[in-house]
């Protein structure tokens, strides 16, 4: 990549070349430089840009906002090796859901910093966790409890309860977690009878939480179950408040809004003076991954249609609208639209005058599937074949689930970081014990 005026030198992180800039720059600036070089070279392939500096900024924000809560990054959200290495260097733990995810991070951190947070595991995966030294794992049924006992000699168990935000982007309570009132007490008693080591309670209010008050409800249930567990002789030293934290702050939801509920609830229900041995962790994914990544695509066709075809308003039949076809779609980077209920919103990479006409547009991916629509109805300037579209905030549940359906390759990723942030990460990594 040629980024004249942007990149001063390169460093290798996780075996990958990362551009280092002496001054801080943003994703769009880097994407513009890459696109310009590609256009000159006749390369119109889509590409991804990851700003490693953004990852550290999110870590700092978390530590300032919820200092008592230690984040364990949800690997499922984005398993990019530069992202994982950066988070590990910054002292992060990891939430893993499978054997493969454990394998991705076991060389980065010690097994004590891994939570196997999948309440339904195969016997082989449980045995693998034992071999890898991973003890902390979740369960939500007597069947899973029995399975773990039969396949792991020394597990540290975390009971997952179901407390869900009904407005969350992705509902998880319908699949995982037991009822905190009717089932959870029975499972704690059963675990105690079986001589199993239950160390705490976990919950997940739903990926993409919109109602932070749900955290308070879940913490109240957790407090009651902690008390029961302690009365049964269980150690109860871990509280896992799950994920659901926003990747980008909006008028409706922010990390501050979540913290405004969580921090006082922890102080009231799990005060440090009476609960000094209770470790509080969380499982954020999109919070760390989303804003660091952008996707830039190329318009491969621009087709004029009656605007009514897009807006579905009969009055727009005589207005112009456009269907933009681009070379990445829902089978690639934009699978988040189908699987994560995310609504990507793109913009022209090139600047357009404010008084330039805007038109109703829909944006299609490149495959033959009619389902491959990234934006149903948006408003954009007139774009032409060969123009570039820029999509910010695309790091969560995107590349990790991308496919090569119809023979379309996954986009290449470019990485950059500013020099000051790189120095901070290196110093942090050098001062921390390596797992």
Curated annotation (Swiss-Prot):
Keywords assigned by UniProt, alphabetized: Decarboxylase, Lyase, Polyamine biosynthesis, Pyridoxal phosphate
Record carries keyword Lyase: yes
SUPFAM superfamilies, per the entry: Alanine racemase C-terminal domain-like, PLP-binding barrel
Top-rank EC class of the record's enzyme: lyase
An individual GO BP term: putrescine biosynthetic process from arginine, via ornithine
Pathway(s) served: Amine and polyamine biosynthesis; putrescine biosynthesis via L-ornithine pathway; putrescine from L-ornithine: step 1/1
Database matches in PROSITE patterns: ODR_DC_2_1, ODR_DC_2_2
Function in brief: Catalyzes the first and rate-limiting step of polyamine biosynthesis that converts ornithine into putrescine, which is the precursor for the polyamines, spermidine and spermine. Polyamines are essential for cell proliferation and are implicated in cellular processes, ranging from DNA replication to apoptosis.
Cofactors, names only: pyridoxal 5'-phosphate
Organism: Panagrellus redivivus (Microworm)
Subunit comment: Homodimer. Only the dimer is catalytically active, as the active sites are constructed of residues from both monomers.
Site keyed Stacks against the aromatic ring of pyridoxal phosphate and stabilizes reaction intermediates: positions: 204
Recorded catalytic activity of this chain's protein: L-ornithine + H(+) = putrescine + CO2
Superkingdom of origin organism: Eukaryota
Activity control: Inhibited by antizyme (AZ) in response to polyamine levels. AZ inhibits the assembly of the functional homodimer by binding to ODC monomers and targeting them for ubiquitin-independent proteolytic destruction by the 26S proteasome.
List of catalytic residues: 368
Protein name according to UniProt: Ornithine decarboxylase
Family stated for the protein in its record: Belongs to the Orn/Lys/Arg decarboxylase class-II family.
PTM sites of type N6-(pyridoxal phosphate)lysine: 76
Cellular compartments per GO CC: cytoplasm
Binding site for pyridoxal 5'-phosphate: 207, 244, 283-286, 397
Protein residues bound to substrate: 339-340, 369
Gene Ontology MF term list: ornithine decarboxylase activity
Pfam families referenced in this protein's UniProt entry, alphabetically: Orn_Arg_deC_N, Orn_DAP_Arg_deC
Gene3D superfamilies: Alanine racemase, Lyase, Ornithine Decarboxylase, Chain A, domain 1
Entry EC number(s): 4.1.1.17
């Amino acid at each position: 990549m040629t980024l004249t005026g942007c990149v001063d030198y390169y460093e290798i992180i996780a075996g990958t070349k990362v551009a280092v800039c002496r001054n801080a720059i943003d994703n769009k600036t880097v994407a513009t430089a890459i696109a310009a070089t590609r256009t000159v070279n006749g390369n119109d392939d889509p590409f991804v840009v990851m700003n490693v500096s953004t990852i550290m900024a999110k870590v700092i924000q978390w530590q300032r906002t919820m200092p008592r809560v230690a984040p364990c990054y949800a690997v499922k959200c984005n398993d990019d090796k530069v992202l994982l290495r950066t988070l590990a260097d910054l002292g992060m733990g990891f939430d893993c859901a499978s054997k493969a995810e454990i394998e991705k991070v076991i060389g980065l951190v010690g097994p004590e910093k891994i939570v196997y947070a999948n309440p339904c595991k195969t016997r082989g995966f449980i045995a693998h966790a034992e071999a890898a030294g991973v003890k902390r794992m979740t369960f939500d049924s007597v069947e899973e409890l029995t399975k773990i006992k039969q396949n792991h000699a020394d597990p540290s168990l975390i009971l997952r309860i179901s407390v869900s935000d009904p407005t969350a982007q992705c509902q998880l309570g319908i699949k995982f977690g037991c009822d905190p009132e009717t089932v959870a007490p029975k499972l704690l008693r059963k675990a105690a009878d079986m001589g199993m080591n239950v160390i705490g309670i976990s919950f997940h209010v739903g990926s993409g939480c919109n109602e932070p008050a749900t955290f308070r409800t879940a913490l109240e249930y957790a407090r009651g179950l902690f008390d029961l567990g302690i009365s049964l002789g269980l150690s109860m030293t871990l509280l896992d408040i799950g994920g659901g934290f926003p990747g980008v702050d909006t008028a409706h939801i922010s990390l501050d809004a979540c913290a405004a509920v969580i921090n006082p609830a922890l102080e009231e229900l799990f005060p440090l003076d009476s609960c000094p041995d209770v470790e509080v962790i969380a499982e954020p994914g999109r919070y760390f991954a989303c804003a660091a990544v952008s996707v830039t695509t190329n318009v491969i066709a621009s087709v004029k249609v009656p605007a009514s075809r897009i807006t579905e308003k009969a009055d727009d039949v005589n207005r112009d609208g456009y269907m933009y076809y681009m070379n990445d779609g829902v089978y690639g980077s934009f699978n988040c639209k189908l699987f994560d209920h995310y609504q990507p919103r793109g913009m022209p990479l090139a600047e357009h005058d404010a008084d330039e006409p805007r038109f109703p547009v829909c944006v299609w991916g490149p495959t033959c599937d009619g389902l491959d629509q990234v934006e149903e109805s948006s408003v954009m300037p007139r774009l032409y074949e060969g123009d570039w579209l820029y999509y910010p905030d695309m790091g969560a549940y995107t590349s990790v689930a991308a496919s090569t359906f119809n023979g379309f390759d996954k986009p290449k990723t470019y990485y950059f970081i500013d020099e000051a942030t790189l120095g901070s990460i290196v110093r942090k990594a050098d001062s921390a014990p390596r797992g």
